[in-house]
Amino acid sequence: MAKRGGKRTVGVPYRFHVTPGIFMNSLVPVADNSGAKLVRVIGVVGHYSKTVHRRIPGAGVGDMVVVVVREGKPELRKQIFRAIVVRQRRPYRRPDGTWVAFEDNAVVIVTPEGDPKGSEIHGPVAMEATLRWPTIANLASIVV
């Protein structure tokens, strides 16, 4: 019989299925005070695009992505960081049946371990991101 379970994620032991709304080469604004203003997504952590032919990696709320800073402080530009998706415009369905969509896409710059680089987060943060990343929940002023 096959083994059940698999890789564990940080935070909750399971991951909500969120419809991907941010894909490779997307330009996404940053929702914290780390100094970056606009980033480009260059990868999705945990997504293996080489195993499925021509599938473009996509990320939803709560996913960690690899980004490069396009606009912001000069010392941060052209640097590669990790980020967590905290808002997406594409609607996704929660387990209770409600549909959620935000006005914009947004990410928060984090360390590879998942600790935020900034000290505050601007705007609302999705509940799925706070459940998966508790350190982001501590900085969030509004959780939707």
Curated annotation (Swiss-Prot):
Domain of life, source organism: Archaea
SUPFAM superfamilies (UniProt xref): Ribosomal protein L14 (SSF50193)
Coiled coil (UniProt feature): none
GO BP terms, alphabetized: translation
Keywords carried by this UniProt record: Ribonucleoprotein, Ribosomal protein, RNA-binding, rRNA-binding
GO cellular component: cytosolic large ribosomal subunit
Single GO MF annotation: structural constituent of ribosome
Signal peptide (residue range): none
RNA-binding found in the keyword field: yes
Oligomer and partners: Part of the 50S ribosomal subunit. Forms a cluster with proteins L3 and L24e, part of which may contact the 16S rRNA in 2 intersubunit bridges.
Family that this chain belongs to: Belongs to the universal ribosomal protein uL14 family.
The protein's role, per its UniProt record: Binds to 23S rRNA. Forms part of two intersubunit bridges in the 70S ribosome.
UniProt name for this protein: Large ribosomal subunit protein uL14
